[in-house]
UniProtKB/Swiss-Prot annotation:
Description of how the protein assembles with itself and partners: Interacts with CCMFN2.
Cellular location(s): Mitochondrion inner membrane
GO biological process: cytochrome complex assembly
Name by which UniProt lists this protein: Cytochrome c biogenesis CcmF C-terminal-like mitochondrial protein
InterPro entries: CcmF_C, CCMFC
Species per Swiss-Prot/TrEMBL record: Arabidopsis thaliana (Mouse-ear cress)
Residue runs in coiled coils: none
Amino acid sequence: MVQLHNFFFFIIFMVVLCGTAAPVLLKWFVSRDVSTGAPFFNGTIIPILISLFSLLVYLHSRKIIRSMDGAKSGVLVRASRPILLPDIIGRSSSETRARKALFFFVPVLHFCLLESKGDFSYLESFCGVLCLLFFCTFFFLARDRSAKRERARRRKGQTLRPNGNEQRRNDKMRCSGHPHLDLERRVEGFGPLAFPVPPELGGACVGGVPPEIGLEALALPRSRQLMAMAVGHDYYQKVPMKMNISHGGVCICMLGVLLSNTKKIQFTQRLPLGYELHMGKERCCLRGLDHLHGPTFHSICGNLMIYKPSLTNDRLMFEHDESLHADLLLINFPASYKNGKLEHFLHWWMKNRKHNNFWLTMFPEKRYFRERTSTAEVAIHTNLFTDLYALIGTGSSRTGGWYTTIMKLPFIFFIWIGFMLASLGGLPSLLRQLQKDKLRWN
């Protein structure tokens, strides 16, 4: 079923990558525009998710049923009194207590940072903490050394030989006077266990167990091993690092999707030249319009400036550039155009150090073709935390301005990072499975 999981996540991440990264990459490298949006995602992800998710639930339920049926044939050591496992009643050391304290302190700190610095609600901060805990569990899973040794033995085709400590313990546990107890039989991953031998094979014993050999002499399975016996021997195994990376990428991708949808900000308003649009902490100003002419179209290119005013000065001043001092209306920027086309519709962040405010410029475009059709070219600004989308619609100076749409989507970059990590961890496993003659989908 691992192959089906990889195939499931691979399709989802490819669809998300095509819907988020492809427009930007194609615009940067080949200057080609592609249209993506809600129809693309709904028509691609929803049918695939419904079909594959139902199949995954069916296969997973079958695997659990088979594991539970196989566990009924396992042999457990019975006793007249309850046995307290040492893993449960053992006193925790200072290192264990420090690790538990750190495990509780990190989520609280993460919650406070998201709620205060990230300006998230309590529900969004709690969801972020859950994603963090889910991500950390894959790195704090205990390692089963016996399962690791058994896998190494299977790879090399050699017999598993006990080390010196285990050999001395086996010699002490060897019962020469009572052959009805076989203390040398081993169960995969559980160490030495006591299995009764029929009395006709040698000797008899009062009560079934000799008085000199008690339950303390038996190497009982630990709590993690009892869990493995309950659901199958292949349930508790060491999780490889590539699986940690893959699941961590899935968590980051889920966190990016959650935060980008809950913290989405969108404004659509008729904006005259020189007026500002308030978007929370940021402001958007329509500085001017430029007319462009292409081979088959003519277009109107908006000149938008998005900035965040400082706390000391509410107005943005451009003392470092004399051309941007007072009049912000109908200012042409010939350096931004080349051969009648927009060379760069994206300008990186710039900072006014004196007034401690940052600003950027965006150039959305409205194209009119000869076939009496029009398309809207979206201006996109991307950084590690926020994506800004600007779109200009119809309007004129006589009607009072142009309809302008500004959209702010935070943490879209987390989706990209999650996709890269999940692909990095799942690609080697997928390539290794494709080299086999027959794939085991279950």
